[in-house]
Amino acid sequence: MERCPSLGVTLYALVVVLGLRATPAGGQHYLHIRPAPSDNLPLVDLIEHPDPIFDPKEKDLNETLLRSLLGGHYDPGFMATSPPEDRPGGGGGAAGGAEDLAELDQLLRQRPSGAMPSEIKGLEFSEGLAQGKKQRLSKKLRRKLQMWLWSQTFCPVLYAWNDLGSRFWPRYVKVGSCFSKRSCSVPEGMVCKPSKSVHLTVLRWRCQRRGGQRCGWIPIQYPIISECKCSC
């Protein structure tokens, strides 16, 4: 099994690349720049019977009634009853390339926000001088280096609309994913992976054949990725 690069290797690489020396504040002996590995959260696709006989009819899609059934679980920020304008097209070829560009554009638009991780904020950079003396960098340069490290390990959740099909209401749900097409560590070797998920309550059309076919809407929990972390 391939092991993750050690923290010592990470620090050595920073020294080589930046020509600087980094030491954690408070006399700590180890610098945890990277988050610990997390679960992959395998959110499997739902498998539906292809026979259209199990699809809801037009009379079963009364939006007023369905909104009443869903109640306060309806979240307009993550649910839609009609195709959202920014929903990426499926399929390969040009559509797939356009979707990749849209994903990259969304990634570039996001920047680290909130509180800077303590592991990065606590870094103290010093520049080696003659006779082994050290000199601390200016606050401005130190801040730039910290922001660079933060941006390299930043793992935002990328959201896109997903069509669940006619057997779910609302039919369109905004799902999350982690951008894993580039490494999120220095040196390279780790990628952004799902670390947390939340559940949306949606309605699912279910048919039972016992005593004749009977169908109806039932509430189900639909998981979506809510957090990504830099992991092995």
From Swiss-Prot:
SUPFAM superfamilies: Cystine-knot cytokines
Effect of residue 222 to C: In SYM1A and TCC
GO terms of molecular function: cytokine binding; protein homodimerization activity
Top-level taxon in the UniProt lineage: Eukaryota
Pfam families, A to Z: Noggin
GO terms classed as biological process: atrial cardiac muscle tissue morphogenesis; axial mesoderm development; BMP signaling pathway; cartilage development; cell differentiation in hindbrain; cranial skeletal system development; dorsal/ventral pattern formation; embryonic digit morphogenesis
Quaternary assembly: Homodimer. Interacts with GDF5; inhibits chondrocyte differentiation.
Known function: Inhibitor of bone morphogenetic proteins (BMP) signaling which is required for growth and patterning of the neural tube and somite. Essential for cartilage morphogenesis and joint formation. Inhibits chondrocyte differentiation through its interaction with GDF5 and, probably, GDF6.
Protein name as annotated: Noggin
Source organism (scientific name): Homo sapiens
Gene designation: NOG
